[in-house]
Amino acid sequence: MKLQVLPLSQEAFSAYGDVIETQQRDFFHINNGLVERYHDLALVEILEQDRTLISINRAQPANLPLTIHELERHPLGTQAFIPMKGEVFVVVVALGDDKPDLSTLRAFITNGEQGVNYHRNVWHHPLFAWQRVTDFLTIDRGGSDNCDVESIPEQELCFA
């Protein structure tokens, strides 16, 4: 099956998580007016008394054409990925309880100035880079096991 890749927007992505970006977002000044603070852009949620981790993930580019055959989810915490050098990347997401609901499967491409924060329990493809090795600032949960993985029928990403 073919999965159309759409431009990432907060409206299209809201069921799956938050788009982390400054475009069309409110800010206030801090540090004597030298800094614009775009405040509270995503909900970080951590369950079971675990702690929030800030890491850097160095992702390798995916081989093209890209075929998706599995999704993962994290029931005990949100997970955010923010490219550190303005790289474009692709995310694949789906809703669903015990298994991904393929009728909700969507693929989005960022504009190079966006990150994503997956809500708890949102199915998503494991992180990969798009065109070159990419460092991602990652905010997620540390502690006990927090990753469910499910195989899905193969989906080939298609770009408009």
From Swiss-Prot:
Listed InterPro entries: RmlC_Cupin_sf (IPR011051), UAH_cupin (IPR047233), Ureidogly_lyase (IPR007247), Ureidogly_lyase_bac (IPR023525), Ureidoglycolate_lyase_dom_sf (IPR024060)
Family annotation (CDD domains): cupin_UAH
Key words, A-Z: Lyase, Purine metabolism
GO molecular function: ureidoglycolate hydrolase activity; ureidoglycolate lyase activity
Keyword Cell cycle: no
Annotated EC: 4.3.2.3
Pathway: Nitrogen metabolism; (S)-allantoin degradation
Family statement drawn from the similarity comment of this UniProt entry: Belongs to the ureidoglycolate lyase family.
Record function comment: Catalyzes the catabolism of the allantoin degradation intermediate (S)-ureidoglycolate, generating urea and glyoxylate. Involved in the anaerobic utilization of allantoin as sole nitrogen source. Reinforces the induction of genes involved in the degradation of allantoin and glyoxylate by producing glyoxylate.
Protein's name in the database: Ureidoglycolate lyase
Origin organism lineage: Bacteria, Pseudomonadati, Pseudomonadota, Gammaproteobacteria, Enterobacterales
